[in-house]
């Protein structure tokens, strides 16, 4: 079992951790999150971005991680970026706790997410169904108030 973690920080009150666990290269990856300080009772986009560079805040993380050159989509879509995790749901206090298994995200192997950045967005991900060009790239999920580089745990 290989485990990786990202500690979320940014220019907002949003903090938390996102962990990734994968047993072997062909196994799905379990993604778990515990995030506090976001908007209450909301759905907010969460994606893995290309670069592990946070020198200019979360904006320097670049676009969604997309090694197969697909368009943006929902985590359950056949056509999607590797980094497309959809939306997290927050409770009345703005906290989100959850987990999901994903077949495209890899901790182990050539398309590993290690050293890349996970970003929690300020808006809701439209899952590529927004009817415009930006939707097919970002899901119109908006600004990047918190992020963290994914590293071996």
UniProtKB/Swiss-Prot annotation:
Belongs to the Cu-Zn superoxide dismutase family. Its main location: cytoplasm. GO terms for cellular component: cytoplasm. Transmembrane segments: none annotated. This is Superoxide dismutase [Cu-Zn]. GO terms for molecular function: copper ion binding; superoxide dismutase activity. Residues 126-137 have a biased composition (Basic and acidic residues). Binds 1 copper ion per subunit. Binds 1 zinc ion per subunit. Zn(2+) binds at residues 64, 72, 81, 84. Cu cation binds at residues 47, 49, 64, 121. Destroys radicals which are normally produced within the cells and which are toxic to biological systems. It comes from the Eukaryota.
């Amino acid at each position: 079992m290989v485990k990786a973690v990202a500690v979320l920080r940014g220019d907002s009150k949003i903090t938390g951790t996102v962990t990734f666990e994968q047993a072997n290269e062909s196994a799905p990856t379990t993604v778990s999150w515990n995030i506090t300080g976001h908007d209450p009772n909301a759905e907010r986009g969460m994606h893995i971005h290309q670069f592990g560079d946070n020198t200019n805040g979360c904006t320097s993380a670049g676009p969604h991680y997309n090694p197969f050159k697909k368009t943006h989509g929902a985590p359950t879509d056949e056509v999607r970026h590797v980094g497309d995790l959809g939306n997290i749901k927050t409770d009345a206090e703005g906290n989100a706790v959850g987990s999901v298994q994903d077949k495209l995200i890899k901790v182990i192997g050539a398309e590993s997410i290690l050293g890349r950045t996970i970003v929690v967005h300020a808006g809701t991900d439209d899952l590529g169904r927004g009817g415009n060009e930006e939707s097919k790239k970002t899901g119109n999920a908006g600004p990047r108030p918190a992020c963290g580089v994914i590293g071996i745990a």
